[in-house]
C-alpha cells in the first residue's frame, strides 16, 4: 500500500498551487470592481475596501457619506463595464497558462504515484510510459476556463445585487461592507473549485493510467481523517471494478469511482493482475 501521508502531500501541493492562482484571480476581480465603482462615483476615491481577510479603519467622514438611490440604468452600466474589464484583466494575467501548468503538475504527481503503486505491488522499480492523456487535459482546460468565467460572473452578480438593493440614503460604509462580503464568498468559491478540480483530474488521469495497463479493478482508499464522508469511510479497503462503481451517496443513490464525486479525496489503489494475491 502506498503511504497515505505521502500521497496526500503530493496532491495537497497541487491543490495549494491552484488555490493560490484562483485567489489571485479573486483579488484582481475585487480590485477591478472597486476601480469601476470609484469611476462611477459610487465609492470615494480615498475609501478603503480591503479583501475579506481584513478591514482596516476607514475615515469616519467617508463612512457616513449617504448615497442617493442608484438608478437601474446605472447599475446595468456599472455591472456591464465591470464584467468586461474583469475579463480583460484576467485574460491579460494568463489564466490559461496557469490552468495548463496545474494540469502538468497533476500529471507529474500522478506519474510518481503510479510508480509508487507499481513498486509497492511488484517489489521492484518499473518504468512505464505515459498513456495519451490529451483527452483528460483538454477537458480540464475547458471546464476550468468555464468555471473561472462563472466565478467572475457570480461576483459581478453579487455586486449588482448590492447596488440594486441600495436605497436612498445608503451609506458608503454599507456598500463597502457588502462588497467585501461578496469578495469573501468569491474567495470561498475559488478554493472549492481548486480542490474539486484537482481531485477530479487526479481521478480521471489515474483511471486512464490503469486502463492503459489493463487494470480493471481497484481497492478504495480514503484519507482516513474526520472529513471523510460516512459512505466513503465504509468503502475504505473494499474491492471494486471501474465499470461498476459503488454507491457513494445512499440518499441520492449515486455511484462513482474514487475522486470523481464532488470534493471526494479518496483514491483508487490498483489491483494488478498477477500481483493481487
For every predicted segment, state its role:
Residues 1-185, 272-277:
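N-terminal leader/targeting and assembly helices and adjacent pre-domain segments
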Amino acid at each position: 500500500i502506498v503511504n497515505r501521508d505521502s500521497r496526500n502531500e503530493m496532491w495537497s501541493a497541487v491543490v495549494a498551487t491552484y488555490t493560490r492562482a484562483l485567489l489571485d484571480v479573486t483579488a484582481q476581480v475585487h480590485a477591478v470592481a472597486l476601480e469601476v465603482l470609484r469611476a462611477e462615483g459610487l465609492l470615494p476615491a480615498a475609501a478603503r475596501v480591503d479583501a475579506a481577510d481584513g478591514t482596516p479603519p476607514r475615515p469616519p467622514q467617508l463612512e457616513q457619506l449617504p448615497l442617493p438611490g442608484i438608478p437601474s440604468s446605472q447599475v446595468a452600466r456599472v455591472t456591464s463595464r465591470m464584467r468586461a474589464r474583469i475579463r480583460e484583466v484576467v485574460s491579460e494575467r494568463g489564466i490559461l497558462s496557469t490552468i495548463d501548468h496545474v494540469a502538468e503538475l497533476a500529471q507529474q504527481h500522478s506519474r510518481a504515484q503510479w510508480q509508487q503503486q507499481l513498486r509497492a505491488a511488484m517489489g521492484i522499480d518499473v518504468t512505464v510510459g505515459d498513456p495519451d492523456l490529451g483527452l483528460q487535459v483538454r477537458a480540464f482546460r475547458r471546464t476550468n476556463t468555464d468555471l473561472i468565467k462563472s466565478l467572475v460572473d457570480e461576483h459581478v452578480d453579487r455586486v449588482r445585487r448590492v447596488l440594486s438593493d441600495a436605497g436612498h440614503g445608503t451609506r458608503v460604509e454599507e456598500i463597502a461592507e457588502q462588497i467585501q462580503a461578496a469578495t469573501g464568498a468569491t474567495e470561498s468559491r475559488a478554493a472549492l473549485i481548486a480542490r474539486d478540480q484537482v481531485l477530479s483530474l487526479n481521478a480521471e488521469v489515474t483511471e486512464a493510467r490503469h486502463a492503459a495497463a489493463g487494470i480493471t479493478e481497484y481497492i478504495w482508499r480514503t484519507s482516513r481523517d474526520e472529513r471523510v464522508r460516512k459512505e466513503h469511510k465504509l468503502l475504505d479497503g473494499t474491492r471494486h471494478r471501474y465499470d461498476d462503481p459503488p454507491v457513494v451517496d445512499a440518499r441520492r443513490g449515486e455511484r462513482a469511482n474514487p475522486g470523481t464525486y464532488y470534493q471526494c479525496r479518496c483514491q483508487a489503489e490498483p489491483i494488478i493482475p498477477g500481483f493481487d494475491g
